[in-house]
Amino acid sequence: MKPWLCLVFFTSAFLIWHAEAEFFTSIGQMTDLIYAEKDLVQSLKEYIRAEETKLSQIKSWAEKMDVLTSKSTSDPEGYLAHPVNAYKLVKRLNTDWLELENLVLQDTTNGFITNLTIQRQFFPTEEDETGAAKALMRLQDTYKLDPETLSRGNLPGTKYRSSLTVSDCFGMGKTAYNDGDYYHTVLWMEQALKQHDEGEDTTVSKVEILDYLSYAVFQFGDLHRAMELTRRLISLDSTHERAGSNLRYFEKLLEKEREKPSNKTVATTEPVVQSGAYERPLDYLPERDIYEALCRGEGVKMTPRRQKRLFCRYHDGNRNPHLLIAPFKEEDEWDSPHIVRYYDVMSDEEIEKIKQLAKPKLARATVRDPKTGVLTVASYRVSKSSWLEEDDDPVVAKVNQRMQQITGLTVKTAELLQVANYGMGGQYEPHFDFSRRPFDSTLKSEGNRLATFLNYMSDVEAGGATVFPDFGAAIWPKKGTAVFWYNLFRSGEGDYRTRHAACPVLVGCKWVSNKWFHERGNEFLRPCGRTEVD
C-alpha cells in the first residue's frame, strides 16, 4: 500500500530524533508524535477503504446469488432442465465460489499492521505515560488546581479545549497508587467516581474505582469513610472477595477503637471525612511552599521602596565599540542580588535556527549528584537539553559573541551554549548554578560558574517563571529577552541568595538557552572587591 511506503520514510526521520524516549520531558519532541499519529490515521483510513471495497464486492455477490438461488430452489428440476443452468451451477460451485472464498480470505490488514508495528517501537513508553501523569499532578499542586479544573480543561491561555474522561482520571489515580501516592490517588479516584456518577459513558466500572479509592482513604486513617466506600462497592458486587475481606478487617479495627475508653464516644459519632479533607504529605524540599507560591505570582517581595531602586537604561557594555551605536535595552529586575533583563538579545530567525540545531541533539537534562558528583537524571529536573558548539553554525558564534559584549566577560572559558526545552509540567526545582563542592574536579581548570546568562526563546502562556525563593523574586519568560546575574561574589565565594528554580510550565512550550561564564579568564574583567560579599 502506498501509505506504508510513505511511513517507512517518515519513520527513518523519527528514529533519528527519538532513539531516546522520555517524550514527556520535551514538548519540542512531543510534536513529532502528533504527525506520527496523523500518519497512522491515514494508514487506518486506507485499511478501512480496502475493507469496504472488499465487503462491497462480497455484498454484491451475495445479492446476486440470493436472487439466483431463490429462482433455482422454487423449481430445481425445471431449473436444471436447461443445460446452461446446469453448467453454470457446476461452474459456480467449482470456480466462482472458490474465487469468493479467496476474496473473503484476502488479508487487507497487512499494510496497516506493518505500519503500526514499525511505529510502535518509537511510541511513548509506560515511563512516558507515568511521567505525563505525574506532570499533571505537579501542575495540580504547584498552581492549586483541583481535579475538576484539570479534568474539564479550564486552564488559562489555552487555545484548544481538552477534557479528561473517567478512564483518564482513573489512569491518573492508578499511576499515583502505584507510586504509593495516596493523596493524589484519592483526588483522582474521587474525580473518576464523580464523572461516573454523572452518567459519563465509560468502560471503567464503579467497582474498580471504589476498590482503589477505599484503600487509599484507609491509608489516610479515615476508617469510617473507607468502610462507607467498601460497603458501596459490595452493594454493586457482592462477590468481590477483597472488598469483603477488607470490610471485615475495617470492622475489627473499628471495634478495637470503640473498646478504648477515651475513644468510646468519638468512635460512634465521628462524621465521615469529606472529599478534599486530606492534607498533602510533607515534601523533601524545605522551601516548597515559598517556591510554589512564587510560581503562582504570590509572595513576590517587590515593595514600592525596592521598586524605586530599579531602573531602565541603555547598556553599551562599558563602552564596547560594538555596542556604542546600538546599545541594548537593560532593565533592573532585582536590586540585591543584582538581576538584569536585556531586550532584543536574539532575533526570531536566530531563535528558530538555534532550536533547529538543538532538536536532533536533545537528551534528558541531568544534574550532578551532590554525593558522588556523577551526572544523573532527577525527577526535580524535567526537560531535555543539548549543547551547541560554535562550529555547529555561525549563528552560535554570533550569539556567544553578543553575550560576551553585553556582559564584558570572556566566553573562552565559558561552557558551551546549552539549549533546553521543557516538557509536560517541565521544571527545574530550586538549585544553585555554582558548585558547592570545593574539590570538584570540574573546577580545576576553568573555576566555578561565575555568572548565568539566560535567554528566553519563547513566550509561555502560563507558568514557567524563573523564581528565587530566598528573596522572593519571580521573572517571567519573554521571547527574545535575557536575564543575567552573578552566582559568585567578587571574592569567589558562592552567593547563596541565587538559589533559583524554573517553575513548571502550565500552558505552552518553553525554550531557553544559557551560557555559564567561569572564573578563569575573568580575573581582571571582574576583579576582587574589598570584602567577601562585594
Swiss-Prot record:
Spans of repeat TPR: 207-240
Residues holding 2-oxoglutarate: 510
Locations listed in the record: Endoplasmic reticulum lumen
SUPFAM superfamilies noted in UniProt: TPR-like (SSF48452)
Primary localization class, coarse: endoplasmic reticulum
GO cellular component terms, A-Z: endoplasmic reticulum; endoplasmic reticulum lumen
Signal sequence interval, chain numbering: 1-21
EC number from the UniProt entry: 1.14.11.2
Key words, A-Z: Dioxygenase, Endoplasmic reticulum, Glycoprotein, Iron, Metal-binding, Oxidoreductase, Signal, TPR repeat, Vitamin C
Cofactor, free-text remark: Binds 1 Fe(2+) ion per subunit.
Enzyme class: oxidoreductase
Cofactor: Fe(2+); L-ascorbate
InterPro entries associated with the record: Oxoglu/Fe-dep_dioxygenase_dom, P4HA-like, Pro_4_hyd_alph, Pro_4_hyd_alph_FE2OG_OXY, Pro_4_hyd_alph_N, TPR-like_helical_dom_sf
Residues that coordinate or bind Fe cation: 431, 433, 500
Parts of the chain that traverse the membrane: none
Record domain Fe2OG dioxygenase: where: 413-519
Top-level taxon of origin: Eukaryota
Glycosylated residues in this chain: 115, 263
Job description of the protein: Catalyzes the post-translational formation of 4-hydroxyproline in -Xaa-Pro-Gly- sequences in collagens and other proteins.
Subunit structure: Heterotetramer of two alpha-2 chains and two beta chains (the beta chain is the multi-functional PDI).
Protein family according to the UniProt entry: Belongs to the P4HA family.
This protein's name: Prolyl 4-hydroxylase subunit alpha-2
Species for this entry: Gallus gallus (Chicken)
